[in-house]
């Protein structure tokens, strides 16, 4: 059994990768989010990312990366390998972004870390169907308004929404999984969650060509009691 960390954004692809890693028998020891100094993620708010890790019962590591970023990543990964006795890294990457090679694979190679990419170049339709089959609840946390209307922000990726999204992607020629930045998601429930999270009061904000969910000042995403969960889940 190999010891691995999962590179965690909090989105649907990271959650699917988590499911596949456990299914493959890897020992998942922590979730790691790489970030620049003083990070502010519009698509993946850090307070919610931390709550996800709490719900999953896993340590969350916020790893600061300094420039030059190639060397910064390698130094950070080397520290993680030593501190956590790692054999490998799991990512939710589906494809190259903008034609660029797989960044993490290049950074891990000189360190002797195996990179597991269970979603790599899979059918988008199959991946979205797998998300539903595993009862992963994901919401569009950020959309590129040049591709999707701002009203998509905050929508839950349920069966009906996915049909609409895939039809639109086929017609307009964009990636149905959002791999090229068309949209981002945040997961509020799924396999391993002690209880669902909810996004009460979150609002849609705008910045340049992005529409994104923002947390009300002074509030945190709350966990719903397992007794009030809409479905039973095997843990």
Residue ranges and their predicted role:
Residues 1-142, 171, 230-231:
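ATP-dependent adenylation/nucleotidyltransferase module used to activate substrates
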Residues 2-3, 58, 87-90, 103-104, ...:
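ATP/NTP-dependent adenylation/nucleotidyl-transfer catalytic domains that generate, transfer
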């Amino acid at each position: 059994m190999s010891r691995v960390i999962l590179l965690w954004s909090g989105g649907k692809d990271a959650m699917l990768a988590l499911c596949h890693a456990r299914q493959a028998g890897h020992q998942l020891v922590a979730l790691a989010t790489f970030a620049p100094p003083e990070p502010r993620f519009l698509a993946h708010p850090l307070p919610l990312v931390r709550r996800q890790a709490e719900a999953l019962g896993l340590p969350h590591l916020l790893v600061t990366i300094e420039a030059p970023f190639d060397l910064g990543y390698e130094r950070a990964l080397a520290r993680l390998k030593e501190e956590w006795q790692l054999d490998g890294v799991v990512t939710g990457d589906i494809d190259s972004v903008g034609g660029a090679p797989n960044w993490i694979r290049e950074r891990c190679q000189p360190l002797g870390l195996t990179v597991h990419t269970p979603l790599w170049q899979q059918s988008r339709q199959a991946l979205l169907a797998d998300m539903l089959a595993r009862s992963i609840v994901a919401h569009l946390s950020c959309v590129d308004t040049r591709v999707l209307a701002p009203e998509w922000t905050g929508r839950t990726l349920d069966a009906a929404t996915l049909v609409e999204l895939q039809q639109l992607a086929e017609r307009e020629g964009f990636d149905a999984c959002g791999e090229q930045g068309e949209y981002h998601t945040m997961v509020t429930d799924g396999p391993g969650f002690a209880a669902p999270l909810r996004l009460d009061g979150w609002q849609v904000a705008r910045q340049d060509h992005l529409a994104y969910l923002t947390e009300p000042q002074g509030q945190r995403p709350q966990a719903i009691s397992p007794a009030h969960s809409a479905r039973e889940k095997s843990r």
